[in-house]
């Protein structure tokens, strides 16, 4: 249970597509992730996670919106506190992709749900998103069943000659 909450909570804050410091915001929803637990002593767990996500409130950059998004991370949980870092890949509706690195923390509640927060930054893009840069924050929740959502906000810049978000 703890591993699913950590995975879901922290994976949600990632995959964003991000001129000159243009603001962006959206809402990302992730299904229950697949988890491979590497072991632990009962007080701490270390896990590899992968989740499929959808932008329920997408943003647009140069007319393209994010579609299929996959998050992969490594996390650890000690008691009710967790942390994770990973990467999120979004395939835009034009076929190009963006890649985000994220990290964050999670606090599990007694009912098995959790709150999460963290930061993200673009590491690269393909096609018209080549040279993308930017960063921001995420904050969200995970349900006891492992599904999760996060509000994502921040800013981005496209490489010289690229158009801004709509």
Regions found by a protein language model. Give the residues of each.
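Hydrophobic h-region of N-terminal signal peptides that target proteins for export
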Residues: 9-18
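Beta-strand-enriched cores of mature, soluble protein domains
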Residues: 19-166
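Positively charged n-region of N-terminal signal peptides that target proteins for export
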Residues: 1-4
